[in-house]
Amino acid sequence: MNRRQLLQALGLSTGSLFLPSRGLAKSAGAPAKRIVFFVTGHGTVYDNWKLRPGGESDDVDIDTDLTSLSTADWSPILAPLERHASKLTILDGLAHVGSIAAAFNEHEEGHATCLTGDLPLPVDGSLGKPSGPSVDQILAAQATTPFRSLEYAVIGGWNVNFDDQGNAIPYESDPVAAWNRLFPGGTDGLDTTASRVARKQHRVLDLAKQRFDALAPQLSTEDRIKLEAHRDLVADLENQVLALQNVECDPIDQPGSSWPEPADEMETFQGLAVAALSCGLTDIITIRGGQLSNALLGAPPGDIHNDFAHSADDDPTAAAVMTDYHTWYAERFAELLDKLDGIPEAGGTMLDHTIVVWTNELSTGSHHHDNMPIVMAGGSFAFDVGRLIRYAPVSPVQGPWSVTSVGRPHNKLLVSLAEAMGHTVSSIGLTDVPLSDGSSLDCTGALDRLT
């Protein structure tokens, strides 16, 4: 299946984009607020990522209008995003302070801190685990859509989504299974296997509800409370099944079962994500990108992780390979923005009403956590967009082995994202970390300068 066929199968070719009128009925007021996390690995090659249009030092704050930049002002890695300049917010100088403060392998920490802002703890050997939820699951806890959240993985990658106990949320890595889950009724009214399963699910859940009602009078108060908790879970599942059976949206065609290139698989999942958002099936999605191959990048022999990512700070060949690596993901991110920005909605586009966050588990392939490469797009309902915002490194965070000066803790960005989605929170993850002078860095509250 070629690229054009994939686009057609997903309903994303020219003239066949999802339109809001084809989605679930919304209130006559403002459109839904949505958020998508696009998470990749191995940090970045900072000198080939950062923007310094005026030749500014890394030691000063910067606030620049991205639409004023020339093509030459864009860095090699971020150049594919130039066409979306007016809707981007490039954040430079944020840090995973939880990972800086933790006392084990920096690589195994980043994925656990990325969306939680938490202090990761080593489990299963050395792999990090947070003690609380990621921001997407904080938002999902109050979601009323058929799916509270969706988590997709392309080429794998460590989990970045966690429940309120710090347990990893599993990814869906099969686009066909993802489609069947979104559209159990199939397309064109066909009586598909998925639709038959959905009907059976409804019957089973109805029988379970009857069983609960019959048992409840026979139980003690303590057991009845436990049973009612299970009944509520079943009721939630029943509502989800019913909602999916009654989706008032033309489902996209089922995708094929093979993808010649990772870019095709990524585009397939992006199409599913846009369809889910457009149809009102969820407002919260994570797309996790895993490790790319040498062949895809045209890289010389060697291990992407150990030979190139680790050496990109001081080896020109490794830096070139990893620049290509992160540029590839920038191109995929730009394509996701193209899809969202191509759908008219409420006097703007779907991108205007969606916050899309490209973030990473690390800041560099050598396992640093300062100067995190974070790019946001859309979200003009909450943020003053079209800007490069640099936070100078003014806070020396005390780690177990060294001191790292940071601009702002990324916990504050997580708070800002939650607030933008309509939640009232004062902190996400850690509330403070130690500074080298014995005082503490406050990690609570929203990130300044976003509005």
Q: Predicted regions span which residues?
A:
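Ligand-binding pockets and gating/stacking loops
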Residues: 1-451
